[in-house]
Amino acid sequence: MPREKPRADEIAIEMMSVCEDETEVEQDPRELYEEEMKEQQQIDCSKQQKEVVAIEELEKRNINKHFFSIQPNTQIPVISSNYIAPVDTSRLLVLIGKTKATYPIMKMFSLSVLAGMLLSVGGLLSITIGKGIPSSDIGIQKIVFGFFNSVGLNLVVLCGGELFTSNCAFLIPGFMEGAYSRWLFFKTHFVVYFGNLVGSIFVSTYFGKLLGSFESPMYLSAVKQIGETKVAMNWGRALLSGIGCNWLVCCAVYFSASAKDLLSKLVVISFLVLTFASLEFENCVGNMFLLSLSHMYGGNFTLGQWILNNLIPVSIGNFIGGTFLLGIPLWYVHVSNVYNIPFLDPLYQQSQAKTQ
Protein backbone atom coordinates (compact mmCIF):
# COMPACT_ATOMS: atom_id res chain seq x y z
CA MET A 1 0.00 0.00 0.00
CA PRO A 2 1.29 3.46 -0.69
CA ARG A 3 2.54 5.36 2.39
CA GLU A 4 0.37 8.25 3.49
CA LYS A 5 1.92 11.68 3.32
CA PRO A 6 2.15 13.49 6.66
CA ARG A 7 -0.31 16.23 7.12
CA ALA A 8 0.66 19.86 7.47
CA ASP A 9 -0.53 20.14 11.06
CA GLU A 10 1.58 17.14 12.11
CA ILE A 11 4.66 18.67 10.48
CA ALA A 12 4.07 21.96 12.31
CA ILE A 13 3.71 20.19 15.66
CA GLU A 14 6.98 18.30 15.10
CA MET A 15 8.84 21.50 14.17
CA MET A 16 7.54 23.27 17.27
CA SER A 17 8.72 20.41 19.49
CA VAL A 18 12.19 20.50 17.91
CA CYS A 19 12.44 24.25 18.47
CA GLU A 20 11.37 23.83 22.10
CA ASP A 21 14.08 21.20 22.59
CA GLU A 22 16.72 23.51 21.09
CA THR A 23 15.68 26.40 23.30
CA GLU A 24 15.86 24.14 26.31
CA VAL A 25 19.41 23.05 25.36
CA GLU A 26 20.72 26.56 24.71
CA GLN A 27 21.66 28.40 27.91
CA ASP A 28 23.25 31.67 28.76
CA PRO A 29 27.11 31.37 28.74
CA ARG A 30 27.26 33.31 32.00
CA GLU A 31 25.04 30.75 33.71
CA LEU A 32 27.22 27.92 32.39
CA TYR A 33 30.37 29.70 33.64
CA GLU A 34 28.83 30.27 37.08
CA GLU A 35 27.82 26.63 37.32
CA GLU A 36 31.32 25.49 36.36
CA MET A 37 32.88 27.83 38.93
CA LYS A 38 30.57 26.52 41.66
CA GLU A 39 31.46 22.94 40.80
CA GLN A 40 35.17 23.79 40.79
CA GLN A 41 34.89 25.51 44.18
CA GLN A 42 33.14 22.48 45.61
CA ILE A 43 35.90 20.21 44.27
CA ASP A 44 38.62 22.49 45.70
CA CYS A 45 36.93 22.61 49.10
CA SER A 46 36.64 18.85 49.23
CA LYS A 47 40.31 18.48 48.29
CA GLN A 48 41.39 20.93 51.00
CA GLN A 49 39.29 19.12 53.59
CA LYS A 50 40.84 15.79 52.61
CA GLU A 51 44.36 17.27 52.80
CA VAL A 52 43.69 18.73 56.25
CA VAL A 53 42.37 15.39 57.50
CA ALA A 54 45.35 13.54 56.02
CA ILE A 55 47.84 15.94 57.64
CA GLU A 56 46.14 15.63 61.03
CA GLU A 57 46.24 11.83 60.83
CA LEU A 58 49.91 11.92 59.82
CA GLU A 59 50.77 14.18 62.74
CA LYS A 60 48.94 11.88 65.17
CA ARG A 61 50.87 8.86 63.91
CA ASN A 62 54.33 10.42 63.83
CA ILE A 63 54.19 12.91 66.69
CA ASN A 64 56.66 10.94 68.83
CA LYS A 65 58.25 8.85 66.14
CA HIS A 66 61.13 11.13 65.15
CA PHE A 67 63.47 13.42 67.02
CA PHE A 68 62.20 17.00 67.33
CA SER A 69 59.07 15.92 65.36
CA ILE A 70 61.11 15.99 62.13
CA GLN A 71 59.50 13.70 59.60
CA PRO A 72 61.66 12.43 56.75
CA ASN A 73 60.53 12.38 53.14
CA THR A 74 58.01 15.17 53.69
CA GLN A 75 58.03 18.28 51.54
CA ILE A 76 57.42 21.59 53.24
CA PRO A 77 56.10 24.16 50.77
CA VAL A 78 57.63 27.63 51.04
CA ILE A 79 55.28 30.33 49.84
CA SER A 80 56.70 33.82 49.52
CA SER A 81 55.75 36.63 47.19
CA ASN A 82 59.15 38.32 47.66
CA TYR A 83 61.32 35.42 46.57
CA ILE A 84 61.99 33.74 43.21
CA ALA A 85 62.89 30.05 43.28
CA PRO A 86 66.51 29.14 42.41
CA VAL A 87 65.36 27.20 39.34
CA ASP A 88 63.54 30.21 37.92
CA THR A 89 66.37 32.59 38.82
CA SER A 90 68.95 30.34 37.16
CA ARG A 91 66.88 30.09 33.99
CA LEU A 92 66.53 33.84 34.06
CA LEU A 93 70.32 34.10 33.86
CA VAL A 94 70.19 32.78 30.29
CA LEU A 95 67.97 35.67 29.23
CA ILE A 96 70.00 38.19 31.24
CA GLY A 97 73.25 36.97 29.68
CA LYS A 98 71.82 37.17 26.16
CA THR A 99 70.60 40.71 26.84
CA LYS A 100 73.99 41.77 28.18
CA ALA A 101 75.93 40.18 25.31
CA THR A 102 73.78 41.83 22.63
CA TYR A 103 74.00 45.37 24.00
CA PRO A 104 75.31 48.00 21.55
CA ILE A 105 78.96 48.56 22.33
CA MET A 106 78.52 52.18 23.45
CA LYS A 107 75.68 51.25 25.80
CA MET A 108 77.76 48.40 27.21
CA PHE A 109 80.78 50.65 27.68
CA SER A 110 78.73 53.44 29.30
CA LEU A 111 77.12 51.04 31.78
CA SER A 112 80.53 49.55 32.63
CA VAL A 113 82.06 53.00 33.23
CA LEU A 114 79.10 53.83 35.47
CA ALA A 115 79.59 50.58 37.38
CA GLY A 116 83.28 51.30 37.93
CA MET A 117 82.46 54.76 39.25
CA LEU A 118 79.71 53.57 41.59
CA LEU A 119 81.80 50.74 42.98
CA SER A 120 84.61 53.21 43.66
CA VAL A 121 82.23 55.38 45.68
CA GLY A 122 81.92 52.47 48.09
CA GLY A 123 85.72 52.32 48.24
CA LEU A 124 85.92 56.02 49.09
CA LEU A 125 83.37 55.63 51.85
CA SER A 126 84.98 52.52 53.32
CA ILE A 127 88.40 54.19 53.52
CA THR A 128 86.97 57.38 55.02
CA ILE A 129 85.05 55.57 57.77
CA GLY A 130 86.85 52.24 58.18
CA LYS A 131 90.40 53.54 58.25
CA GLY A 132 89.42 56.24 60.70
CA ILE A 133 89.03 53.56 63.38
CA PRO A 134 92.22 52.87 65.39
CA SER A 135 94.22 49.91 64.09
CA SER A 136 94.17 48.36 67.58
CA ASP A 137 90.51 47.45 66.99
CA ILE A 138 91.36 45.43 63.88
CA GLY A 139 88.18 43.33 63.95
CA ILE A 140 85.85 46.31 64.16
CA GLN A 141 87.89 48.10 61.52
CA LYS A 142 87.48 45.21 59.07
CA ILE A 143 83.76 44.92 59.72
CA VAL A 144 83.16 48.64 59.24
CA PHE A 145 85.39 48.73 56.16
CA GLY A 146 83.55 45.79 54.61
CA PHE A 147 80.07 47.06 55.47
CA PHE A 148 80.52 50.48 53.89
CA ASN A 149 82.33 48.92 50.95
CA SER A 150 79.04 47.20 50.10
CA VAL A 151 77.52 50.58 49.23
CA GLY A 152 79.32 50.41 45.89
CA LEU A 153 77.89 47.05 44.80
CA ASN A 154 74.42 48.05 46.00
CA LEU A 155 74.57 51.14 43.79
CA VAL A 156 75.77 49.10 40.81
CA VAL A 157 72.94 46.57 41.12
CA LEU A 158 70.24 49.20 41.62
CA CYS A 159 71.48 51.30 38.69
CA GLY A 160 71.85 48.33 36.35
CA GLY A 161 75.56 48.83 35.76
CA GLU A 162 77.80 46.32 33.98
CA LEU A 163 80.41 44.84 36.30
CA PHE A 164 83.08 42.41 35.11
CA THR A 165 83.05 40.37 38.30
CA SER A 166 79.31 39.67 38.37
CA ASN A 167 79.22 39.10 34.60
CA CYS A 168 81.54 36.13 35.10
CA ALA A 169 78.56 34.22 36.52
CA PHE A 170 75.77 35.90 34.54
CA LEU A 171 77.19 35.40 31.04
CA ILE A 172 78.24 31.75 31.16
CA PRO A 173 74.77 30.08 31.38
CA GLY A 174 73.57 31.73 28.17
CA PHE A 175 76.86 30.93 26.45
CA MET A 176 76.61 27.27 27.48
CA GLU A 177 73.06 27.18 26.13
CA GLY A 178 74.21 28.61 22.79
CA ALA A 179 72.23 31.82 23.16
CA TYR A 180 75.11 33.84 21.70
CA SER A 181 78.46 33.27 20.06
CA ARG A 182 81.93 32.93 21.53
CA TRP A 183 82.84 36.31 20.03
CA LEU A 184 80.06 38.11 21.91
CA PHE A 185 81.02 36.32 25.14
CA PHE A 186 84.65 37.49 25.10
CA LYS A 187 83.83 40.91 23.61
CA THR A 188 81.41 41.62 26.46
CA HIS A 189 83.99 40.69 29.09
CA PHE A 190 86.69 42.81 27.44
CA VAL A 191 84.53 45.93 26.96
CA VAL A 192 83.08 45.75 30.48
CA TYR A 193 86.52 45.18 32.03
CA PHE A 194 87.98 48.20 30.23
CA GLY A 195 84.97 50.36 31.13
CA ASN A 196 85.26 49.40 34.81
CA LEU A 197 88.93 50.41 34.69
CA VAL A 198 88.10 53.81 33.19
CA GLY A 199 85.36 54.51 35.75
CA SER A 200 87.50 53.44 38.71
CA ILE A 201 90.49 55.55 37.69
CA PHE A 202 88.22 58.56 37.08
CA VAL A 203 86.85 58.43 40.64
CA SER A 204 90.28 57.83 42.20
CA THR A 205 91.71 60.77 40.23
CA TYR A 206 88.91 63.30 40.64
CA PHE A 207 87.34 62.48 44.01
CA GLY A 208 90.40 60.89 45.58
CA LYS A 209 93.45 62.86 44.46
CA LEU A 210 92.32 66.21 43.02
CA LEU A 211 89.97 66.91 45.93
CA GLY A 212 92.65 65.90 48.44
CA SER A 213 90.31 63.59 50.32
CA PHE A 214 93.12 61.61 52.01
CA GLU A 215 95.92 64.12 52.53
CA SER A 216 95.79 63.97 56.32
CA PRO A 217 98.63 61.85 57.80
CA MET A 218 96.28 59.18 59.16
CA TYR A 219 94.56 58.56 55.83
CA LEU A 220 97.73 59.04 53.77
CA SER A 221 99.57 56.22 55.51
CA ALA A 222 96.50 53.97 55.31
CA VAL A 223 96.06 54.54 51.56
CA LYS A 224 99.74 53.84 50.89
CA GLN A 225 99.67 50.71 53.02
CA ILE A 226 96.64 49.33 51.16
CA GLY A 227 98.38 49.47 47.80
CA GLU A 228 101.76 48.25 49.01
CA THR A 229 100.22 45.27 50.82
CA LYS A 230 98.25 44.20 47.77
CA VAL A 231 101.21 44.48 45.40
CA ALA A 232 103.50 42.57 47.80
CA MET A 233 101.14 39.57 47.74
CA ASN A 234 102.52 36.57 45.86
CA TRP A 235 100.88 35.44 42.62
CA GLY A 236 99.32 32.25 43.96
CA ARG A 237 97.75 33.92 46.97
CA ALA A 238 96.33 36.70 44.81
CA LEU A 239 94.84 34.13 42.43
CA LEU A 240 93.19 32.09 45.20
CA SER A 241 91.98 35.21 46.96
CA GLY A 242 90.39 36.40 43.72
CA ILE A 243 88.58 33.07 43.32
CA GLY A 244 87.03 33.30 46.78
CA CYS A 245 86.14 36.95 46.38
CA ASN A 246 84.20 36.67 43.16
CA TRP A 247 82.46 33.52 44.29
CA LEU A 248 80.90 35.58 47.10
CA VAL A 249 80.31 38.63 44.90
CA CYS A 250 78.46 36.58 42.29
CA CYS A 251 76.45 34.88 45.03
CA ALA A 252 75.44 38.33 46.29
CA VAL A 253 74.28 39.51 42.86
CA TYR A 254 72.57 36.17 42.14
CA PHE A 255 70.68 36.20 45.45
CA SER A 256 69.68 39.82 44.87
CA ALA A 257 68.22 38.76 41.51
CA SER A 258 66.04 36.22 43.32
CA ALA A 259 64.68 38.91 45.68
CA LYS A 260 61.77 41.07 44.54
CA ASP A 261 61.81 43.80 47.17
CA LEU A 262 64.49 46.44 47.61
CA LEU A 263 65.27 45.73 51.26
CA SER A 264 66.05 42.07 50.61
CA LYS A 265 68.42 42.99 47.79
CA LEU A 266 70.30 45.47 49.97
CA VAL A 267 70.58 43.09 52.92
CA VAL A 268 71.91 40.09 51.00
CA ILE A 269 74.44 42.18 49.05
CA SER A 270 75.64 44.01 52.16
CA PHE A 271 76.28 40.87 54.19
CA LEU A 272 78.13 39.01 51.44
CA VAL A 273 80.30 42.01 50.56
CA LEU A 274 80.98 42.44 54.27
CA THR A 275 82.11 38.81 54.31
CA PHE A 276 84.64 38.97 51.48
CA ALA A 277 85.94 42.41 52.43
CA SER A 278 86.45 41.40 56.07
CA LEU A 279 88.31 38.29 54.89
CA GLU A 280 90.49 40.58 52.72
CA PHE A 281 89.70 38.75 49.49
CA GLU A 282 90.81 40.46 46.29
CA ASN A 283 88.40 42.08 43.83
CA CYS A 284 89.93 43.24 40.54
CA VAL A 285 87.49 46.14 39.98
CA GLY A 286 87.83 47.29 43.58
CA ASN A 287 91.61 47.10 43.25
CA MET A 288 91.47 49.26 40.12
CA PHE A 289 90.31 52.05 42.40
CA LEU A 290 92.37 51.26 45.50
CA LEU A 291 95.70 50.67 43.75
CA SER A 292 95.37 53.66 41.41
CA LEU A 293 94.53 55.83 44.43
CA SER A 294 97.47 54.44 46.40
CA HIS A 295 99.81 55.01 43.45
CA MET A 296 98.68 58.65 43.14
CA TYR A 297 99.36 59.24 46.84
CA GLY A 298 102.92 57.95 46.57
CA GLY A 299 102.63 54.22 47.21
CA ASN A 300 105.97 52.41 46.90
CA PHE A 301 105.24 50.37 43.77
CA THR A 302 105.32 50.88 40.03
CA LEU A 303 102.53 50.61 37.49
CA GLY A 304 104.07 47.41 36.14
CA GLN A 305 104.09 45.84 39.60
CA TRP A 306 100.45 46.79 40.05
CA ILE A 307 99.45 45.09 36.80
CA LEU A 308 101.69 42.00 36.98
CA ASN A 309 101.58 41.28 40.71
CA ASN A 310 97.94 42.07 41.42
CA LEU A 311 95.65 43.01 38.55
CA ILE A 312 96.35 39.99 36.31
CA PRO A 313 96.24 37.20 38.93
CA VAL A 314 93.23 38.71 40.73
CA SER A 315 91.33 39.13 37.46
CA ILE A 316 92.01 35.50 36.50
CA GLY A 317 90.93 34.38 39.96
CA ASN A 318 87.74 36.45 39.76
CA PHE A 319 86.91 34.88 36.40
CA ILE A 320 87.46 31.36 37.75
CA GLY A 321 85.45 31.99 40.91
CA GLY A 322 82.43 33.51 39.21
CA THR A 323 82.37 31.21 36.19
CA PHE A 324 83.33 27.81 37.56
CA LEU A 325 82.15 28.05 41.18
CA LEU A 326 78.73 29.57 40.52
CA GLY A 327 77.79 30.17 36.89
CA ILE A 328 78.46 26.70 35.47
CA PRO A 329 77.08 24.81 38.51
CA LEU A 330 73.84 26.80 38.35
CA TRP A 331 73.56 26.16 34.62
CA TYR A 332 74.26 22.44 35.02
CA VAL A 333 71.80 21.88 37.86
CA HIS A 334 68.91 24.16 36.94
CA VAL A 335 69.13 24.90 33.21
CA SER A 336 70.76 22.05 31.32
CA ASN A 337 69.46 18.54 30.85
CA VAL A 338 70.89 16.58 33.77
CA TYR A 339 73.33 13.99 32.52
CA ASN A 340 72.27 10.73 34.14
CA ILE A 341 74.95 8.20 35.05
CA PRO A 342 73.56 4.73 34.26
CA PHE A 343 75.19 2.78 37.09
CA LEU A 344 74.40 5.46 39.70
CA ASP A 345 70.89 6.47 38.66
CA PRO A 346 68.32 3.69 39.20
CA LEU A 347 65.51 5.74 37.66
CA TYR A 348 67.56 6.13 34.51
CA GLN A 349 68.08 2.37 34.35
CA GLN A 350 64.35 1.74 34.75
CA SER A 351 63.48 4.17 31.97
CA GLN A 352 66.03 2.58 29.65
CA ALA A 353 64.68 -0.90 30.42
CA LYS A 354 61.13 0.19 29.59
CA THR A 355 62.17 1.70 26.27
CA GLN A 356 63.96 -1.50 25.29
Curated annotation (Swiss-Prot):
Q: Which UniProt keywords apply?
A: Membrane, Transmembrane, Transmembrane helix, Transport
Q: Name one GO cellular component term.
A: plasma membrane
Q: Where exactly are the transmembrane stretches of this chain? A: 109-129, 143-163, 183-203, 238-258, 266-286, 311-331
Xref: InterPro entries:
Aquaporin-like, For/NO2_transpt, For/NO2_transpt_CS
Q: Specify whether Plastid is a keyword of the entry.
A: no
Coiled coil located at which positions? Answer: none
Q: How does it assemble?
A: Homopentamer.
Q: What does this protein do?
A: Monocarboxylate-proton symporter; active in acidic-to-neutral pH range. Transports formate, acetate and L-lactate.
Record family assignment:
Belongs to the FNT transporter (TC 1.A.16) family.
Q: What is the protein named?
A: Formate-nitrite transporter
The species this protein was found in: Entamoeba histolytica (strain ATCC 30459 / HM-1:IMSS / ABRM)
